[in-house]
């Protein structure tokens, strides 16, 4: 329909355009001669005849007449070309001059198609065109009418020529009867016009008919498409049926193979039967040879007779047996058709059993025969010759038995071959199973993974066994080390608390980091998961610890029982030695376990990755398992359906099975009867053999009697013997007769049974027929069940393979289970023992915990006592000072000191002992230093990123060594003090005398001292107890030192490994040198403080030493009074020394602790700072993202505006183009009109000249001239009318031209406005693009800065995590020592209180500074508010500026020159500056001042912009500083416990920064206020420039001064900013250092977490593997049950499969039905071909009708039209007749081609194009038909194809001829078209000549009355349209006929494809 509408629209357009072109041509009949094209060549007949006519008519004409004819022809050419040009322009084709118009050119057909718009017309079938419309008839009618018109025009032309001749002949010049001629011409013209209009109406009707025909054709095409869809559905159904037929064919072939194999087995059985019968015959022949005597000849004859009868009976029985066997074979064949291979195999097995039974019976019969032979031997012993013969016969008989055995062996070999066949079938089944085993590969992989996991479990079990052995060995060690375990538990608790704190910190950091990046969130989630796993692992570790404790308690109980059992001390000593060895071994194992754990930790990452891979594989396996379960569910549903069907089948089969059982019982009876008959036949054969032997004996005896009568006696004896034998044989014969009678009876019974069985067989055959029908019905469902059976069989094979694999796995698992059970029993026993031991250990542990709690309480009390002692010591020091002064006075007079000097010597000895003790302690300190070095090495090895920290630690170690040196120096000082004491003792001896004098005074004071000493004694007792406890602790420490020494060896090996790691980490240490420098500075400060503290401590120790010495002196003096005080004095001295040492150690530990606390606090503060920095960065990121989003929104808005503006511009351009095209068309029309007017004027001039020449001739008489004058006047009037019409048309065109010009002006105005708007929009776009580029640049810079900051932050974070990790490792190692000495740290509370006071003071200062910061923040807020106000003011200023701009716009509109200048400057400067410039240009006198003000304005604007940018930069710096202030605040809040120096520096920096910020903000405020005032003043001055000239100059001067001041201030602000940036860089470096520390710490935390995760994952793997073992056991049981079920299901499915083969027969019936359906389809196709033939008959009739019509037209033309005009168009009519003849021939050829034989190829000719899918499906169908129909189908099909190929070749030839003739017909139509155009041009030229002639008559003839005559006006008729329509219809018919050629090529392709099948 779309094509129709397009064609209809084209025709309507043609109508309108042709009408307009004709109007224009009527107004302007002439056209320029430059557009002239060559004339077309007319056909042969027409050109020749015209030439002849020209020769005959030109005999009496002059040369002048020929010139006039040439002029007329030129005018015709002009008119033809004008019409063609107009038609070309109206149809839209501008290249009409390029197209040739010759009728014989090959491109004219395409030209007509393009010109007429025929390519858009719909493709129609020739059938529909010829049946539904008589187009050819109508075309011929139209052509005949056109020919009549041409004829009439020819007559007119001849009349005109004759009139011209008469005018030219001077001899026969007469006056023309003008009135008659004019009336004649007018009548003719009116007739022609009426005829022409009638023909136009007829052409219009024909076009309408064409449209209806095309609509009908469209409907038919739609119906045809529906038919195609139906055909495709039929094809799909056929394909499905053929696929089912394929499957049935395959099953039939399989059944045929089975039948062949069964026939082979039957043939082998028959061969065995024949062999047995041949053996029976040989036995009969041997029996016939046994005849001996003549007397027995009668008997023998009787026996022979009997044997013959028996043989006849046997033959009859053989026949019966053969009949039975045939019936049985038929029955077996029925069974073979009904039963499957399994039933046949069962039959074969039954036959084998029967044959085995028959062989057994034959053996029994052979045994009986042997017994009979033995009897014969016994009877014939007398006759030795007979015995030899009998022995030979026996040997031959044995050989025969051997041959029978050989035949049996052969039969067995046949059976073995059949077994091989069965094996081959089974091998095929196994191959199918192997093909399906690939699907079970995944299960095998799972099993391998399970085995791998089982191996791992075994390894873990071995490890557990080793650990349990270690636990058993370490049971005694646990007793000794319970205290150590308690301490370690405490350490673990501390570590757990620290870990919890670190977790809290990490959680806080994670919560802050989650807001930054999603990736970090994911990592933190992973960390949280790891932490949860750690918690789970810790819980599991706690459970394991509890279990271990329980085991240790059990072990302790066991050890106690063992100790109770052990009686002797020798055994105890041996056990101790063994325990020591076990301890050493256990320590070694522990070291190894530690190494293994480390290796496990190192390998954990790889295990983690493998675990992830396993998880992925597990997920994949789960997905596969789900798919398998889905498949199993589907199969289960299918099995349920099959079971339902099976139930139905079983119901039917139950009846069949009953009948089969009855038949089988009958067959068994028949087989038994056959066996008995066979036995009897064998007996008869044996008897016949015996008879034959006897006959041979008789024959021999007779011969012997003939030759020897002498031996008659002996022969008689022999005869007697033979008679006895004969009697025995008769008895046997009687027995045989009885047996034969019995056999006959049995045979009668069997015959009756056979009759019954035959009846049963008939009944069964009827049942079998019903069953076959049922089976045919069942075979319909077989197709659906085959797929299910295949899937079930595949599943069965898979499950069977799985069953086999699982059985093997079950066996292995059962073996492993047995092993595991034994191991588990052993382990359970061990576990029971361990549980008992652990319970005992737990009890002990509880007791020890209670003891530890008590000891803690005692420690608390001791700490309190120590505090009291210190206070008392201080008091004692003050008292001792007083006492020393008193003793100095009393020493001179004290006599008793002589005795005490000896005691001093003893004291010296004790001091020497103490010196030795100090040496030992020094050695212990060295050992401790070595341990510390080892620990430091371990720390170096563990902390991979703290290489420089090792150097710091080494420096600390050197400091410790220096401290040891200082201690050694203190020892030397003690020695010097001892020397001094000796010197003092000498002095004391000198002062004794002085002391004696003061003894009385001392005694008074002694009482007070005794009281104080008593107090001291009490304190010393308490201290002694404490010292005892400390000694126990020291012993424990020594034991621990021994353990540590053993561990140092392990650590040394680890240290070597760690050195390698440190060598790798040295590369990363270069990045951390900056961090370590900062740390070294802090460490140096701390070391300086430590040195100060050490100096103070040395002073204190010296004081303590002095006090100790003085106390020793006092105690010596008191011991002189009381000897008991000496011991206490010694204890005090020792205690003081211990206190010194322990105070030193405590000081060292406190220093280390303080350092670690400081470092931890620094790390925490750094973490908080980093968190705050991250939050700040996140805020910045969010702000920047918001700004970027806003900018993107702005950009999107701008882009939308750009798109909108571009659309508007496009619309404007389109309008402009359309208007320009209209303008060009109008200009062309104008030019055409002018050219036509020029042509008219030229033709008029020529015509006037010719008339004047006629008038001036002398040969013309006066009346002729008068007549000519009258005619001239008459024609002039008509010509004036024509000129009036042309003038009117010209005026109309001029009006149109003016309108177009007006439109053009409007468009020009629009274009100017749009150009102006476009320039403005372009300027705005450029601005927006610049802004967009600036935004993009800023965005890129910000993104780069953000990326750099994020990278720096991540790097810092990584470094901080590494530092934290290293610090945590050091912390974990130092916390052990801190935990040991935590009870003693309370002594330093006084110092801590002092520090707290200092810290409180610092806190107060910090709070004050915070208040200052808050004030500064308030100032910043106020500054921001002022900035916002400033921005508001700026916005108000901008509004004022906008108002000024509006004012200036008004002024600019007044002066166009100023507007041009403004528009020229508008691209480079702002609108404000341009408007100011235009305002300045107004002022002539103030141009200079105004230019200066403009320059100042620009400078101020630039400065304002710079100030705004600076303000923005300052705002950004303020915001950054605010963020940094907040960050520093948080840092300072976290760093309350840091050093004073850092706090002071930071506070000073903050104060400086705040001051600078305040100064900057104040400066910015001042600048903003000043600039705002300046802007306001400047704007006011600009507004009043015309009125206030003098004020402008003064204000400009002031503004210059202020600008200079502002520039200076801005420079100062920039300098301050540079200083701030340097300070900020320093702060950033500090932050980077802290972030690096934090990164190192975070890396250490990650390693710890990874280790914990590894432990957790290992434990989870152990649990998972244990669960997998249990699940495997469950799976084994389930698989076994499943295998049993599957075996049952397999047996059932086999039974089902046996029943389903019966459906094949039904499918064969279906195949027959399909064959019949295909034949029916074939017939339907043939009928369709016949219908097409009938349609061709209708076509023939239509052609005949058209021929008749043509004949009638010819007759009418001959009757109506004279010969002269017929000759012009007769050639065209002949060509058309020839083409119609060709059409008839083509239709005959098509009719012949439609008479096709039956075949499948005609079905595919309906499609218009070759579809490969259709051909492929057709090939498949042909192949299926070949498979179904056999080899004959191919032959028939090839014959059909050959016929088709031959016929289609003939068709091709006819089509080729037809196509050539169609082209010729198209050319002839083109020639007709050209001739018609020429005729139209001729008619127009004739009308013009007639009008000119009329004007001449009016002018020249006085009698002529123009009013009485009808004025001639050129009729405006649509002649060209009707002609085009006729041509269009012709070409449409040609197109339809060409479709036949296309279909012919398509048919050829189809036939070629079919021939390739």
Curated annotation (Swiss-Prot):
<feature type="coiled-coil region">
    <location>
        <begin position="804"/>
        <end position="1235"/>
    </location>
</feature>
<dbReference type="GO" id="GO:0035974">
    <property type="term" value="C:meiotic spindle pole body"/>
</dbReference>
<comment type="subunit">
    <text>Monomer.</text>
</comment>
<feature type="compositionally biased region" description="Polar residues">
    <location>
        <begin position="90"/>
        <end position="102"/>
    </location>
</feature>
<protein>
    <recommendedName>
        <fullName>Sporulation-specific protein 15</fullName>
    </recommendedName>
</protein>
<keyword id="KW-0963">Cytoplasm</keyword>
<feature type="region of interest" description="Disordered">
    <location>
        <begin position="1"/>
        <end position="102"/>
    </location>
</feature>
<feature type="compositionally biased region" description="Basic and acidic residues">
    <location>
        <begin position="58"/>
        <end position="83"/>
    </location>
</feature>
<dbReference type="GO" id="GO:0031322">
    <property type="term" value="P:ascospore-type prospore-specific spindle pole body remodeling"/>
</dbReference>
<dbReference type="GO" id="GO:0005737">
    <property type="term" value="C:cytoplasm"/>
</dbReference>
<feature type="coiled-coil region">
    <location>
        <begin position="1481"/>
        <end position="1723"/>
    </location>
</feature>
<comment type="similarity">
    <text>Belongs to the MPC70 family.</text>
</comment>
<feature type="coiled-coil region">
    <location>
        <begin position="1320"/>
        <end position="1471"/>
    </location>
</feature>
<dbReference type="GO" id="GO:0044732">
    <property type="term" value="C:mitotic spindle pole body"/>
</dbReference>
<feature type="compositionally biased region" description="Low complexity">
    <location>
        <begin position="1"/>
        <end position="12"/>
    </location>
</feature>
<feature type="coiled-coil region">
    <location>
        <begin position="199"/>
        <end position="785"/>
    </location>
</feature>
<keyword id="KW-0175">Coiled coil</keyword>
<feature type="compositionally biased region" description="Low complexity">
    <location>
        <begin position="19"/>
        <end position="28"/>
    </location>
</feature>
<keyword id="KW-0597">Phosphoprotein</keyword>
<comment type="function">
    <text>Has a role in the initiation of spore membrane formation.</text>
</comment>
<keyword id="KW-0206">Cytoskeleton</keyword>
<feature type="modified residue" description="Phosphoserine">
    <location>
        <position position="105"/>
    </location>
</feature>
<keyword id="KW-0749">Sporulation</keyword>
């Amino acid at each position: 329909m779309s094509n129709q509408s397009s064609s209809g629209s084209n025709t309507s357009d043609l109508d309108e355009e042709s009408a307009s072109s004709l109007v224009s041509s009527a107004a302007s009949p002439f056209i320029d001669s430059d557009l002239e094209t060559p004339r077309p060549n007319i056909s042969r007949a027409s050109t020749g005849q015209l030439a002849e006519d020209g020769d005959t008519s030109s005999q009496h004409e002059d040369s002048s007449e020929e010139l006039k004819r040439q002029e007329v022809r030129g005018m015709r050419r002009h008119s033809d070309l004008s019409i063609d040009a107009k038609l070309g322009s109206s149809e839209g084709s501008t290249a009409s001059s390029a197209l040739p118009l010759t009728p014989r050119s090959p491109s004219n057909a395409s030209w007509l198609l393009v010109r007429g718009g025929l390519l858009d017309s719909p493709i129609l079938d020739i059938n529909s065109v010829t049946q539904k419309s008589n187009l050819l008839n109508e075309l011929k009618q139209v052509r005949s009418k056109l020919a009549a018109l041409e004829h009439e025009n020819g007559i007119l032309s001849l009349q005109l020529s004759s009139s011209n001749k008469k005018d030219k002949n001077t001899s026969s010049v007469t006056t023309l009867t003008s009135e008659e001629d004019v009336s004649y011409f007018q009548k003719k013209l009116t007739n022609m016009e009426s005829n022409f209009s009638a023909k136009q109406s007829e052409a219009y009707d024909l076009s309408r008919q064409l449209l209806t025909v095309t609509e009908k054709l469209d409907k038919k095409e739609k119906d045809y498409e529906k038919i195609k869809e139906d055909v495709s559905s039929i094809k799909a159904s056929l394909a499905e049926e053929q696929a089912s037929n394929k499957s049935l064919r395959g099953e039939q072939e399989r059944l045929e193979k089975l039948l062949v194999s069964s026939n082979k087995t039957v043939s082998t059985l028959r061969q065995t039967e024949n062999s047995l019968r041949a053996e029976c015959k040989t036995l009969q022949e041997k029996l016939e040879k046994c005849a001996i005597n003549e007397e027995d000849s009668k008997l023998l004859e009787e026996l022979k007779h009997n044997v013959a009868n028996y043989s006849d009976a046997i033959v009859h029985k053989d026949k019966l047996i053969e009949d039975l066997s045939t019936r049985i074979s038929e029955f077996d064949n029925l069974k073979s058709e009904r039963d499957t291979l399994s039933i046949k195999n069962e039959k074969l097995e039954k036959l084998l059993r029967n044959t085995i039974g028959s062989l057994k019976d034959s053996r029994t019969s052979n045994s009986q025969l042997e017994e009979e032979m033995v009897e014969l031997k016994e009877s014939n012993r007398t006759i030795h010759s007979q015995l030899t013969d009998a022995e030979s016969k026996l040997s031959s008989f044995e050989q025969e038995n051997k041959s029978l055995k050989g035949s049996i062996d052969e039969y067995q070999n046949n059976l073995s071959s059949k077994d091989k066949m069965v094996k081959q079938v089974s091998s095929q089944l196994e191959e199918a199973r192997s093909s399906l085993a690939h699907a079970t590969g995944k299960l095998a992989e799972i099993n391998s993974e399970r085995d791998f996991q089982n191996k791992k479990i075994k390894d873990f079990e071995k490890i557990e066994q080793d650990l349990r052995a270690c636990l058993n060995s370490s049971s005694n060690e646990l007793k000794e080390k319970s205290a150590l375990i308690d301490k370690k538990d405490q350490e673990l608790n501390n570590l757990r608390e620290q870990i919890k704190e670190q977790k809290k910190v990490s959680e806080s950091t994670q919560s802050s980091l989650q807001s930054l990046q999603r990736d970090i969130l994911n990592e933190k989630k992973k960390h949280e998961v790891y932490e949860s796993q750690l918690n789970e692992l810790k819980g599991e570790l706690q459970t394991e610890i509890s279990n271990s404790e329980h085991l240790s308690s059990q072990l302790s109980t066991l050890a106690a029982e063992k100790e109770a059992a052990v009686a002797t001390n020798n055994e105890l000593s041996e056990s101790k030695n063994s325990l020591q060895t076990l301890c050493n071994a256990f320590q070694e194992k522990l070291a190894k376990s530690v190494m293994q754990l480390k290796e496990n930790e190192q390998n954990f990452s790889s295990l983690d990755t493998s675990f992830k891979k396993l998880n992925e594989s597990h997920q994949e396996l789960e997905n596969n398992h789900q798919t398998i379960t889905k498949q199993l569910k589907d199969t289960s549903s299918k099995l349920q359906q099959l079971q339902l069907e099976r139930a139905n089948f079983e119901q039917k089969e139950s009846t069949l099975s009953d009948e089969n059982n009855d038949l089988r019982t009958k067959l068994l009876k028949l087989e038994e009867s056959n066996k008995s008959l066979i036995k009897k036949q064998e007996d008869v054969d044996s008897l016949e053999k015996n008879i034959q032997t006897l006959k041979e004996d008789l024959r021999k005896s007779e011969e012997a009697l003939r030759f020897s009568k002498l031996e008659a006696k002996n022969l008689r004896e022999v005869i007697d013997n033979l008679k006895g034998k004969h009697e025995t044989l008769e008895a046997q014969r009687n027995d045989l007769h009885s047996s034969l009678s019995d056999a006959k009876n049995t045979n009668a019974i069997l015959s009756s049974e056979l009759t019954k069985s035959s009846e049963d067989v008939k009944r069964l055959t009827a049942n079998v027929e019903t069953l076959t029908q049922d089976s045919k019905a069942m075979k319909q469902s077989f197709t659906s069940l085959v797929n299910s059976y295949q899937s079930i069989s595949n599943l069965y094979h898979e499950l069977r393979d799985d069953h086999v694999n699982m059985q093997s796995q079950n066996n292995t698992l059962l073996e492993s289970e047995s092993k595991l059970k034994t191991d588990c029993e052993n382990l359970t026993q061990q576990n029971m023992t361990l549980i008992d031991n652990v319970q005992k250990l737990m009890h002990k542990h509880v007791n020890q915990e209670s003891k530890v709690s008590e000891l803690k309480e005692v420690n608390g009390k001791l700490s309190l006592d120590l505090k009291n002692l210190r206070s008392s010591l201080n008091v004692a020091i003050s008292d001792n000072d007083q006492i020393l002064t008193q003793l100095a006075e009393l020493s001179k007079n004290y006599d008793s000191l002589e005795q005490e000097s000896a005691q001093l010597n003893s004291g010296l000895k004790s001091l020497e002992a103490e010196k030795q003790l100090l040496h030992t302690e020094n050695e212990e300190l060295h050992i401790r230093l070595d341990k510390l070095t080892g620990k430091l090495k371990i720390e170096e090895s563990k902390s991979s990123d703290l290489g420089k920290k090792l150097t710091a630690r080494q420096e600390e170690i050197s400091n410790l060594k220096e401290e040891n040196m200082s201690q050694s120096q203190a020892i030397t000082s003690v020695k010097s003090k001892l020397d001094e004491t000796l010197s003092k003792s000498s002095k004391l001896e000198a002062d004794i005398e002085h002391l004696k004098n003061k003894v009385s005074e001392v005694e008074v004071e002694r009482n007070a001292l005794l009281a104080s000493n008593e107090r001291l004694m009490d304190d010393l007792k308490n201290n002694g107890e404490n010292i005892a406890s400390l000694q126990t602790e020291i012993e424990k420490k020594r034991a621990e030192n021994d353990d540590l020494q053993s561990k140092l060896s392990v650590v040394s090996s680890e240290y070597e490994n760690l050195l390698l790691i440190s060598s790798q980490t040295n590369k990363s240490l270069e990045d951390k040198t900056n961090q370590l420098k900062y740390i070294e500075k802090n460490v140096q400060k701390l070391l300086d403080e430590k040195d100060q503290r050490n100096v103070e401590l040395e002073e204190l120790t010296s004081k303590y030493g002095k006090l100790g010495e003085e106390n020793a002196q006092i105690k010596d003096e008191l011991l002189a009074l009381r000897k008991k005080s000496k011991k206490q004095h010694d204890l005090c001295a020792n205690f003081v020394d211990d206190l010194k040492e322990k105070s030193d150690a405590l000081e060292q530990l406190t220093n280390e602790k303080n350092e670690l606390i400081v470092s931890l606090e620094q790390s925490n503060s750094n973490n908080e700072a980093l968190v705050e920095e991250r939050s700040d960065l996140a805020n910045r990121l969010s702000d920047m993202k918001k700004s970027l989003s806003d900018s993107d929104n702005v950009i999107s808005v701008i882009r939308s505006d750009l798109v909108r503006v571009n659309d508007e511009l496009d619309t404007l351009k389109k309008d402009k183009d359309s208007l320009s095209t209209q303008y060009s068309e109008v200009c062309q029309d104008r030019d055409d009109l002018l050219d036509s007017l020029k042509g008219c004027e030229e033709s008029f001039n020529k015509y006037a000249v010719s008339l004047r020449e006629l008038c001036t001739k002398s040969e013309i008489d006066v009346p002729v001239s008068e007549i000519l004058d009258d005619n001239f006047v008459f024609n002039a009037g008509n010509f004036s009318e024509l000129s009036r019409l042309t003038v009117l048309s010209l005026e109309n065109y001029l009006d149109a031209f003016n309108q177009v010009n007006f439109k053009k002006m409007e468009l020009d105005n629009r274009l100017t406005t749009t150009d102006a708007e476009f320039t403005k929009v372009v300027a705005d776009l450029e601005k927006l693009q610049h802004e967009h580029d600036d935004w993009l640049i800023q965005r890129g810079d910000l993104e780069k800065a953000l990326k750099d900051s994020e990278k720096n932050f991540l790097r810092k974070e990584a470094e901080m995590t590494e530092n934290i990790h290293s610090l945590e490792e050091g912390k974990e190692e130092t916390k052990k020592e801190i935990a040991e000495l935590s009870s003693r740290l309370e002594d330093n509370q006084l110092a801590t209180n002092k520090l707290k006071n200092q810290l409180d003071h610092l806190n107060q200062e910090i709070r004050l500074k915070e208040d200052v910061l808050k004030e500064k923040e308030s100032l910043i807020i106020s500054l921001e508010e002022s900035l916002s106000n400033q921005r508001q003011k700026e916005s108000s200023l901008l509004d004022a500026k906008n108002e000024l701009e509006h004012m200036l716009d008004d002024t600019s509109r007044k002066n166009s020159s100023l507007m041009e200048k403004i528009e020229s400057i508008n691209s480079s400067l702002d609108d404000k500056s341009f408007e100011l410039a235009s305002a300045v240009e107004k002022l002539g006198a103030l141009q200079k001042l105004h230019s200066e003000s403009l320059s100042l304005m620009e400078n101020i604007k630039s400065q304002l912009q710079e100030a705004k940018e600076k303000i923005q930069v300052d705002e950004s710096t303020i915001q950054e500083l605010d963020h940094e202030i907040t960050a520093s605040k948080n840092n300072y809040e976290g760093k309350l416990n840091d050093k004073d120096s850092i706090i002071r520096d930071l506070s000073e920096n903050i104060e400086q920064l705040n001051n600078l910020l305040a100064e900057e903000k104040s400066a910015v405020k001042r600048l903003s206020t000043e600039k705002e005032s300046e802007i306001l003043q400047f704007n006011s001055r600009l507004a009043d420039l015309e009125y206030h000239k003098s004020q402008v100059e003064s204000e400009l001067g002031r503004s210059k001064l202020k600008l200079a001041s502002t520039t200076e201030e801005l420079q100062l602000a920039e300098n301050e900013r540079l200083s701030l940036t340097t300070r900020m860089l320093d702060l950033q470096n500090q932050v980077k250092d802290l972030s690096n520390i934090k990164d190192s710490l975070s890396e250490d935390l990650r390693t710890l977490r990874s280790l914990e995760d590894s432990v957790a994952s290992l434990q989870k793997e152990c649990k998972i593997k244990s669960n997998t073992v249990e699940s495997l056991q469950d799976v084994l049981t389930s698989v076994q049950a499943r295998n049993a079920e599957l075996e049952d299901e397999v047996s059932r499915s086999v039974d089902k499969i046996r029943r389903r083969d019966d459906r094949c027969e039904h499918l064969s019936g279906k195949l027959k039905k399909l064959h019949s359906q295909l034949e029916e389809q074939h017939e339907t196709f043939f009928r369709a071909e016949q219908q097409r033939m009938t349609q061709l008959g209708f076509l023939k009739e239509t052609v005949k009708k058209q021929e008749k019509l043509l004949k009638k037209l010819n007759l009418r033309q001959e009757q109506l039209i004279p010969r002269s005009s017929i000759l012009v168009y007769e050639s065209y009519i002949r060509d058309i007749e020839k083409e119609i003849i060709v059409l008839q021939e083509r239709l005959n050829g098509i009719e012949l081609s439609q008479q096709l034989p039956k075949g499948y190829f005609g079905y595919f000719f309906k499609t218009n194009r070759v579809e490969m899918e259709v051909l492929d499906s057709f090939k498949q169908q042909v192949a299926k038909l070949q498979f179904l129909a056999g080899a004959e189908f191919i032959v028939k099909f090839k014959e059909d194809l050959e016929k088709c190929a031959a016929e289609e070749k003939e068709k091709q030839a006819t089509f080729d001829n037809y196509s050539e003739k169609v082209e010729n017909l198209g050319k002839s139509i083109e020639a007709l078209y050209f001739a018609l155009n020429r005729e139209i041009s001729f008619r127009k030229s004739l009308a013009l000549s007639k009008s000119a002639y009329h004007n001449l008559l009016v002018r020249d003839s006085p009698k002529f009355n123009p009013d009485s005559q009808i004025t001639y006006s050129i009729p405006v008729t649509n002649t060209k349209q009707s002609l085009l329509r006729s041509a269009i219809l012709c070409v449409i018919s040609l197109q339809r006929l060409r479709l036949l050629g296309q279909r012919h090529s398509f048919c050829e392709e189809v036939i070629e494809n079919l021939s390739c099948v």
